[in-house]
């Protein structure tokens, strides 16, 4: 049970116990209207793509508003031959819909084959599928995972391209991780590590712009595996994720994006650091907690503040404050209509009450 809870608590940067809900600045109608009036007067695909991206950035956390803009930005980027724009849009859409609308996510993954064909983009295409499957495993979507594993077993490794072999290594490690946790064969978790490590080793032979997305997913999964195996290298892996995120942002020199969300990923990465518990010093735990909370406050994200504070005080042994923050987290989720599986949240809260000797709650 402990391993299942820990896996749920630290399932990559998408926390299933306390799912992030970045509550940043709301959409800005005046700026949005101004950009919308420019569209009919803008025939150039690159310029239209810029407008759609800026509209998406202005949509705040409303996926309902942002998704159509990202789809339009993808179409214009494809017309303009804007590789960064295509990758940015596809990555956003797959990540957002992987656990919300699997068929839609699968559509974007299939679309990447025609929009970004060839070996040069093979690793990026693999990253979309890897992330999608990774999310399905974290969400315990048995049917999807079983189908993917059957396909994986049917592949002849010797006949795979170098890029396909990297994908095979990662997915094999992911499969071992998934089956170990779901069958409670926790001693087998460590067997997944060499596969993901080999995937990373082989990825380093490729240019950064080709490998970046898949490499980030590999580091994220490896951080989970190290964490579950009580390996202190987990911290370094999360740090690599943050570094790659920053490098991806730095690659975008097409136009200014003042409303781009540049901090959400790092906020969640620092939140994940809190789960390292005994693997890092108390000073580092405090440092990562403060970094996460600082970003969350700047974004006005009360859900992240409460949920990460609950984790932090649980880690530091202040169970009374941890329980109080869990209560606040649940209240925010309900008031904001945030979808969350409350069962593991209540299970954690119950565990903390038991640790405090409060058996009435």
Question: Where are the regions a protein language model picked out?
Answer:
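A "functional boundary" signal
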Residues: 22-361
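Positively charged n-region of N-terminal signal peptides that target proteins for export
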Residues: 1-7
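Bacterial N-terminal signal peptides
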Residues: 8-20
